[in-house]
């Protein structure tokens, strides 16, 4: 069944987990560093398994499902690496090595939204994070591919229901 498949897929973790737990109980020179590195190995192996088996992990759509398809992963990685680029469906499909139609259908099936909607959402995540850090709307608009700061403000309000200024005020009031 599913449990046997998961067990078999994660068998490679046995040694890393065994080392991690035995090292975590010791007080030896370098043990903290070794525990940190072993934890990173375990985390990477779990993420690799998740990317290779999203359905078995119960993931039905989203970033993980998109990254589990090598072709879509190329487009997703490009969007994440350069969110301010003027990405178009054509450019993303080319990055994925697919036709526009095949790319659009595969992306929507795996990720649950269109590539351009995904990019817009990713940009908003970045805008929110950078606003929290004190960046200006003007700077963010220039870096994230918006024609103007007012264009970014309109997109922000359309997505979140409030202006960036109102959003920051709410954040400060909750904080």
Predicted feature locations:
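Amphipathic alpha-helices of TPR/Sel1-like and other helical repeat/solenoid scaffolds
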Residues: 15-20
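PAPS/PAP-binding and catalytic site of the sulfotransferase fold
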Residues: 43, 103, 152
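Terminal helix-turn-helix DNA-binding modules in bacterial transcription factors
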Residues: 74-93, 98-99, 105-150, 159-162, ...
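Short C-terminal domain-edge/linker segments immediately following a structured domain
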Residues: 8-13, 150
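Short, Lys/Arg-enriched, Trp-marked, Pro/Gly-tolerant hinge/linker segments that flank
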Residues: 2-10, 24-39, 43-85, 90-91, ...
């Amino acid at each position: 069944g599913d449990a046997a498949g998961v067990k078999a897929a994660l068998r490679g973790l046995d040694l890393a987990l065994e080392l991690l737990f035995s090292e975590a109980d010791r007080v030896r020179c370098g043990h903290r560093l070794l525990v940190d590195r072993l934890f990173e190995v375990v985390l990477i192996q779990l993420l690799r398994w998740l990317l290779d088996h999203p359905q078995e992990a119960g993931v039905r759509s989203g970033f993980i499902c998109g990254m589990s398809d090598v072709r879509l992963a190329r487009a997703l990685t490009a969007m994440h690496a350069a969110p301010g680029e003027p990405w178009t469906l054509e450019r993303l499909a080319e990055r994925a090595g697919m036709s526009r139609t095949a790319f659009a259908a595969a992306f929507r099936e795996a990720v649950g939204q269109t590539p351009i909607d995904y990019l817009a959402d990713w940009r908003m995540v970045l805008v929110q994070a950078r606003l929290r850090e004190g960046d200006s709307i003007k700077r963010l608009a220039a870096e994230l591919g918006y024609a103007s700061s007012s264009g970014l403000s309109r997109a922000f309000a359309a997505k979140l229901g409030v202006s960036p200024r109102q959003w920051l005020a709410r954040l400060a009031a909750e904080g």
